[in-house]
A protein has these predicted regions:
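Predominantly a Rossmann-like dinucleotide-binding segment in NAD(P)-dependent oxidoreductases
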Residues: 1-55, 60-62, 193
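Conserved loop-to-helix N-cap of the C-terminal "lid" that shapes the substrate pocket in Rossmann-like
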Residues: 13-16, 170-176
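A general structural signal for well-ordered alpha-helical segments in protein cores
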Residues: 19-20, 156-157, 183
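C-terminal glycine/acidic-rich active-site capping loop/insertion
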Residues: 43-53, 61, 65-66, 89-174, ...
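Glycine-rich phosphate/pyrophosphate-binding beta-alpha loops
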Residues: 75-83
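C-terminal hydrophobic helical "lid"/dimerization subdomain
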Residues: 177-188
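C-terminal capping/lid region of NAD(P)-dependent oxidoreductase domains
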Residues: 188-198
Length: 198
């Protein structure tokens, strides 16, 4: 199902909506314009399903302008599995830069390379200069509960808590809908080469 845009909404929806949601959460602002450049360069080129070639993109860039004046960018590469870190999330502002380096699931890390990477946080203040790097180890019990470096555990716990106690979920229906809307706008921009206003 996830080899075709018609079934998945496209890579920028299916794989990237979570990152668009994180952008909104971190910035506490709504997107107003999205621009993307993306394509299919490596993955699934020789596959056929029912005679049809997969058309999902495996790489791209997305720029999101927010109502607050903040700007965010997503870089996607679906064929860089050899990297030490699967995700690199950065925020830059007038006080400096903070980077979170997140490895992929440890079960995919080749044994011959030694222990799987540990998540890292790098805080680089503007003044005084001097990056501070620290490992952020994740409890192995949380890693066993699901992927995403333990966050699956917290997602399930918060969701179960909302059901059992009748509270609001941590992520609303509107949050999910906006993340998908951002992904669809990015897909449209990538297809047309034009910015999409939300």
């Amino acid at each position: 199902w996830n080899r075709f845009n018609a079934r998945s909404g496209g890579t920028l929806v299916e794989k990237c909506c979570h990152f668009f949601d994180l952008m909104r959460l971190a910035l506490q602002s709504e997107p107003v314009r999205i621009m993307a450049s993306a394509g299919q360069s490596v993955n699934h080129l020789d596959e056929r399903y029912g005679g049809a070639a997969p058309d999902i993109w495996d790489n791209g860039y997305v720029i999101v302008d927010f109502a607050s004046g903040a700007r965010a960018m997503l870089e996607l590469c679906m064929f860089a599995e050899g990297s030490r870190y699967q995700e690199e999330v950065c925020a830059t502002g007038p006080s400096g830069k903070i980077e979170a380096l997140v490895p992929g699931p440890g079960r995919f890390w080749p044994e011959h390379l030694g222990a799987a990477p540990v998540p890292r946080l790098i805080v680089s203040p503007r003044d005084p200069k001097g990056p501070v790097e620290m490992d952020i180890p994740v409890d192995p019990t949380l890693l066993e509960a699901g992927d995403h470096n333990g966050s699956t555990f917290y997602q399930h716990r918060l969701f179960a808590q909302a059901i059992r106690q009748g509270g609001a979920p941590a992520v609303s229906l509107n949050d999910g809908a906006m993340a998908v809307r951002m992904g669809l706008a990015a897909q449209q921009s990538g297809l047309t080469g034009q910015a999409v206003t939300l």
